[in-house]
Amino acid sequence: MNSKIFAVLFLLAFLSCVLSDQYCPKSSITACKKMNIRNDCCKDDDCTGGSWCCATPCGNFCKYPTDRPGGKRAAGGKSCKTGYVY
């Protein structure tokens, strides 16, 4: 009996971990003028309060993760600089 309860609890815990994936939110903006593109972050460490560095057409911004896919995390790298990229 105890092994059945353990198996059910284990399965529920496993499913909650699998189903709780987090993503950057999808941007509602599809295009941005080059002179308006700026990066507030280059990597997640640049963000505070559990937010992630997410890429948008207007640059990288700190956003809180969501459970809906569609957004894109910022790639960062040595060439990424904060501020206006124009």
UniProtKB/Swiss-Prot annotation:
It is found in: Secreted. GO terms for cellular component: extracellular region. Expressed by the venom gland. One of its GO terms (biological process) is defense response to bacterium. Its main location: secreted. Disulfide bonds join C24-C54, C32-C58, C41-C53, C42-C80, C47-C62. Residues 21-66 form the WAP domain. Keywords: Antibiotic, Antimicrobial, Disulfide bond, Secreted, Signal, Toxin. One of its GO terms (molecular function) is toxin activity. InterPro entries: Elafin-like_sf. Contains 5 disulfide bonds. Residues 1-20 form the signal peptide. Belongs to the venom protein 11 family. 01 (wap-1) subfamily. Has antibacterial activity. This is U15-lycotoxin-Ls1d.
